[in-house]
Amino acid sequence: MLIDRLAGAVPAHAWPTITVAGAVMVVVLLMRYLDYDKKVEVPVIGPGGRFTKWLGAIRNVWYAREAIHEVANGQHGKLGFQIPTMTRMDVFICDRALTREYYSLDEDHMSFRAVMSEEFQFKWLLPGQHHDVHRIPNSVIAKALSWQRTRASKADDPFFREFSAEFLYGFQEEMRAFTGCGNKSRLPFFSHAGDHTSGNSGWIAAPCFPLALKVIARLTTKSLFGEPLCRNPKFLDMCCEFGDAVPRDAMILRCFPDFIRPLLARFLAAPRGVKELQTVVLNEITSRRNSREKNPMKDLLDFSINWIDEHSADGWEDWHIADMMTNTVFAALHTSSQLVTHTLFELATRPEYVVPLREEIRQCFALYGNGTKAAIDAMHKMDSFIKETQRCNPLDASALARLVLKPYTFSNGLHVPKGSFIFTPNSPLFEDEQFYEDAKRFDGLRFARMRDDPKRKSDSPMTATSEYSMHFGIGRHACPGRYMVSDEVKLVMVHLLLHYDFAMANFGPRPKNMAFGKFILPDMQAKVWLRKSKDAGNTARVDPGAPDGVASEPS
């Protein structure tokens, strides 16, 4: 082989010199790669010198969140700051007036799309969604979701009834799989059944996040694609694998220089997953085009097909839909699944909330109908508990990410050059007594009581956005899918509360969150104990997935 010949041609005594020279070259290249400039005149948190900031960058791989909280808690100036990462300086604007100034700018100046393209490496992992390519505007999926939300609110429209029924079917299927009675998934962390605990207690220990992910995948694909795809086990696994691969592969690519990324991407899972998903979606589009006159518009895929037909003169084609839908799958799955997991962890370790939440569910079903959208929307205590869970377990320590595409000077004279990455602190706001009384304490009914305050009533729903609650962004880039997230999480929790008792495995404490950089994630391996509820068994049981007025047996 060529390598063997080259090795044989090099004298043995030369190898130590070559090894040292190679190591020096690697260090020089690494230092050159990390030798980015401090471009914005705000303080650097931690080492910020030309050849020392990489020490801070390495620390921030694990502790960026702590650094952001230290600054926001008043240890540094209130205007802004920056922290070194492995590839750049992340600039944080703390001043509220300046924050409003930058997030209100148009995409040509400060781009949300561009920063998402960089964070998730769309150029290599999802090329059709890269910020500078011809792609279906975000406003289209927003309009589609608004259309679906309107359908859900109409009592005579079957959409929400079918959506909640799909949840019940999906939950029962996944529980059968976890208890060894159903089809096994090809995914490694779904391949094992839930464990039956010892004795005759009736408890089953199920992996919480995998169960949440599969159920949310069924609901999301129901909304996006409808049947038969939302009931296709292989397609569901593909969606889950892809949703997991994109953030993981993006993190890997960001650790390497630009010139290495296209080569490395060939060996990653996300590019393969994108092709698999898009092939399935394109085949479904072709099938629907062949039978469109026979079928009404039922889901977001139908809406998108109609949209590109109406705008075909602008060069839109079916593969643009496949790109958009694939991106939506990635964006939707983990957000909802992590929130379900966090919420279940909180409720399993706070049993004092179980009775009032169960009572509210039954009252709302009695007033507005079993499983109706009106009943789900009337559950203010449930909404509050989920939002408080979000407040205490925010995914990202930052919010309102933007990439500066044109140099910009703020009204106070602060200049940010092209290429700067701009953020504002997010999670520190949830610990600020200025916005949340007794902010360090978990209060599951905090936002339910807030509805009685005329000044804060509009900020109390889970889907509301404000400058001190930016889970879903704010302004023109606020997440249009937040209403679907709310419905999905509530359907899961309503069903569990009506039909199950639950606790953490071995009646232990809440599993600790996992921190990485600016992010925290729930423990993906933790198990929750589930048991058919005796309390539910002694009452007339109702279910979000059953027809109005019909009691359903627990799965």
Swiss-Prot record:
The chain crosses the membrane at residues 10-30. Its cofactor is heme. Heme binds at C479. One of its GO terms (cellular component) is membrane. It holds the Pfam family p450. Gene3D superfamilies: Cytochrome P450. This is Cytochrome P450 monooxygeanse terQ. The lineage of its organism: Eukaryota, Fungi, Dikarya, Ascomycota, Pezizomycotina.
